[in-house]
């Protein structure tokens, strides 16, 4: 075989198995937002390289659009936009303290959590109280959409993409469907508002 032909065949075979080449088999997003669509197209190769199956990626990215409610929300977080004393006055209230004291005594799962995970109940109670008001405010944002919006904005791209990949792995494993992955605008979910990773 001629060296030039052999080199051409080798290059074609390498391109056929590379993440960048795999990316082109996925349908592009068409949100109407050029920045978001460019990010989504670029991200697909990284998701495939991280082990996300092409069919999962194509299904979950199909029809994905930026969430206008998320845009700019990270600059308005009360814990970062208020003086700490004002923030604490709003979250450490007599009602919340009373609920915490009742929950501390009532929740039967605390001994198991403390033993299995090494998390003291008072730490868990504090997180539970501050993050979701003991589960009363968990958010209803589509976690994948929120994280994709943050990634496309660029300021927190690396962090958000890591969380998107973690979200896609949860979906891919069958642990939870995307419809159950709901939470805050920042991608935090559940009663303790933990992020996907």
Segments predicted by a language model, with ranges:
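Bacterial N-terminal signal peptides
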Residues: 8-16
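Mature N-terminal segment immediately following signal peptide/propeptide cleavage
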Residues: 32-59, 66
């Amino acid at each position: 075989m001629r060296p030039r032909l052999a080199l051409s065949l080798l290059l074609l075979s390498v391109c056929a198995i590379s993440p960048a080449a795999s990316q082109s088999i996925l349908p592009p997003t068409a949100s109407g937002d050029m920045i978001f669509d460019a990010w989504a197209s670029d991200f697909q190769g990284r998701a495939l390289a991280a082990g996300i199956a092409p069919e999962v990626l194509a299904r979950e990215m199909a029809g994905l659009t930026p969430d206008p409610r998320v845009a700019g929300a990270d600059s308005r977080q009360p814990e970062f936009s208020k003086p700490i004393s004002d923030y604490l006055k709003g979250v450490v209230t007599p009602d919340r303290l009373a609920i915490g004291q009742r929950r501390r005594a009532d929740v039967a799962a605390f001994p198991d959590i403390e033993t299995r995970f090494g998390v003291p109940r008072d730490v868990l109670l504090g997180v539970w109280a501050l993050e979701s008001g003991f589960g009363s405010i968990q958010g209803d944002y589509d976690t994948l959409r929120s994280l994709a919006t943050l990634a496309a904005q660029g300021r927190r791209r690396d962090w958000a993409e890591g969380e998107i990949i973690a979200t896609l792995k949860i979906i891919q494993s069958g642990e939870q469907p995307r419809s159950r992955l709901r939470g805050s605008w920042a991608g935090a979910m559940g009663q303790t508002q933990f992020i996907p990773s």
